[in-house]
């Protein structure tokens, strides 16, 4: 699984996932399923944000190519992917600027159009079960929840899906592609089942050999949001990143 993750995801996503795991004392080489899950979640958060802006009238617009007008403001502030200290700094800055209630837990995004924090979920299980788990943990109506599954299902607070259908379809397609790529390499079952994952881990540790059949090339095409990893994510210089294209798994 580790080799698959490093081949399938953008190197910047992989690096962020590694840092996040190490921050909590976890080893990506051992907890490979969690490594894959974190990379997937990061990519969904970035795709959620990509290309969405607010114009001078306060309307949400999509700009997919070229440099948008400097007056445009990014609709979403990305919080996921930061170390905890910087993430809370961003959250506090947003709360002080907008007057919204500070969340108890770190959210993934902030939506400047709807003036709300967003919690993104990506699940291998039933979306409604994962949604309820998120809601019970957060216990706040102020944070919007949006759950995606690898089967194309989704669930959001009050059925408000925030994004347009095409933008959500991109995310669903990417998740389905990841599932298919895992399945073709015999990794999906262990990714879904903890029991199977433990069995696979013991086998991998015993063999200590790289997985066969993995693609030999890594895509270095960077999602626009990945180019925004500066100390604070609130300036308009991020717009030049729109020239980049979405990352996709490369097949051998």
Swiss-Prot record:
Range of residues in the leader sequence: none
One Pfam short name: Flu_PA
Site for Important for efficient shutoff activity, residues: 202-203, 206
MF terms (GO), sorted A to Z: RNA binding
Residues the record marks as active site: 80, 108
Keyword list, A-Z: Decay of host mRNAs by virus, Eukaryotic host gene expression shutoff by virus, Host cytoplasm, Host gene expression shutoff by virus, Host mRNA suppression by virus, Host nucleus, Host-virus interaction
Domain of life: Viruses
Compartments in which it is found: Host cytoplasm; Host nucleus
BP terms from Gene Ontology: viral RNA genome replication; viral translational frameshifting
Principal subcellular localisation of the protein: host cell
InterPro entries listed in its UniProt record: PA/PA-X (IPR001009), PA/PA-X_sf (IPR038372)
Family of this protein: Belongs to the influenza viruses PA-X family.
Reported function: Plays a major role in the shutoff of the host protein expression by cleaving mRNAs probably via an endonuclease activity. This host shutoff allows the virus to escape from the host antiviral response. Hijacks host RNA splicing machinery to selectively target host RNAs containing introns for destruction. This may explain the preferential degradation of RNAs that have undergone co- or post-transcriptional processing.
Domain notes: The probable endonuclease active site in the N-terminus and the basic amino acid cluster in the C-terminus are important for the shutoff activity. The C-terminus acts as a nuclear localization signal. The C-terminus is recruited to host protein complexes involved in nuclear Pol II RNA processing.
Protein name: Protein PA-X
Species in which this protein is naturally found: Influenza A virus (strain A/Guinea fowl/Hong Kong/38/2002 H5N1 genotype X0)
């Amino acid at each position: 699984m580790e080799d698959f993750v490093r081949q399938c995801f953008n190197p910047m996503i992989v690096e962020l996932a590694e840092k996040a795991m190490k921050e909590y004392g976890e080893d990506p080489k051992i907890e490979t399923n969690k490594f894959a899950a974190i990379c997937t979640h990061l990519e969904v958060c970035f795709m959620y944000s990509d290309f969405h802006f607010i114009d001078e009238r306060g309307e949400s617009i999509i700009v997919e190519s070229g440099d948008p007008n400097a007056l445009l403001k990014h609709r979403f502030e990305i919080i996921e992917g930061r170390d905890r200290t910087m993430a809370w700094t961003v959250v506090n800055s947003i709360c002080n600027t907008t007057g919204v209630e500070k969340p108890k837990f770190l959210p993934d995004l902030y939506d400047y159009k709807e003036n709300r924090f967003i919690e993104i979920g990506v699940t291998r299980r039933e979306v409604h079960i994962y949604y309820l788990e998120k809601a019970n943990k957060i216990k706040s109506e102020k944070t919007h929840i949006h759950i995606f599954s690898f089967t194309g299902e989704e669930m959001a607070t009050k059925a408000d899906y925030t994004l347009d259908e095409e933008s959500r379809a991109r995310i669903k397609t990417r998740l389905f592609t990841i599932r298919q790529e895992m399945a073709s390499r015999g990794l999906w079952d262990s990714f879904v089942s903890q029991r199977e994952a433990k069995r696979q881990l013991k086998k991998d540790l015993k063999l200590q050999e790289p997985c066969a059949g993995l693609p030999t090339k890594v895509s270095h095409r960077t999602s626009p949001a990945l180019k925004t990893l500066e100390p604070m994510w609130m300036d308009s210089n991020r717009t030049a990143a729109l020239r980049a294209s979405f990352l996709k798994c490369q097949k051998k």
